[in-house]
Amino acid sequence: MIVDVSAIVFCKIRHNVRCYCLRFHRKAPFAVIATQNPVGSAGTQLLPQAQLDRFMVRLEMGYPDFESQVNILRDRQQDDPLTQVREVSSAEALLEMQRQAQSVHMADPLLEYVTRLTEATRAHPLVLLGVSPRGALAVCRMAKSRAFMHGRDYVLPEDVQSVFIDVCAHRLFLAPKAKISDTTAADVLTGLLKQVRRPDHI
């Protein structure tokens, strides 16, 4: 199936998509999940930086641990495990959790901390294109979600630090000399977390 990434991004932002003369409205909640093969890229093209910036977070899965691999094999001995999937939440409940998560308080010192971190990415000598304001907003949203998942109604500096790399690594466009020195986006961001002072008092 051929998928127009621009159309998916448009649908994500504008809540509708057009196909020929028809317009389809999407219902909330709506999320776009994409996979990327770390090895083969024949016949594919990298997403433009502007479209990568629309994805809130990128996770690197790697291989599952030994026990998980055994469970994968065990679960597929008889039936397809997908037949055992059950609904655990309604769309309405999920939307309410999203609303509650975004109502979590984030104090000004933390907003300034996020801004200092993202500005530092733009000034880094190994970075050609740093984290955008949209990326900074994504850091705030993810930090609030983490605080909510930990049962708090306020964000702590460790919430920001915990999500910073996963939210920002795919948004960095590194200079060629970064590849020469074998420096990754995660390396750059890890260094900035050590260099940029976190707020002492919230």
What kind of region is each of these model predictions?
Residues 1, 35, 55, 114, ...:
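Conserved RecA-like P-loop NTPase ATPase core
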Residues 1-17:
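N-terminal low-complexity segments that are often proline-rich with Ser/Thr-Pro
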Residues 14, 51, 73-77, 118, ...:
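Hydrophobic aliphatic residues
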Residues 18-104, 144-146:
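Canonical AAA+ ATPase core
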Residues 63-67, 71-74, 81-84, 102-106, ...:
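Non-catalytic accessory segments flanking P-loop/AAA+ NTPase cores
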Residues 84-139:
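Conserved AAA+ ATPase small/helical "lid" subdomain
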Residues 123-202:
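C-terminal engagement/docking regions of AAA+ P-loop ATPases
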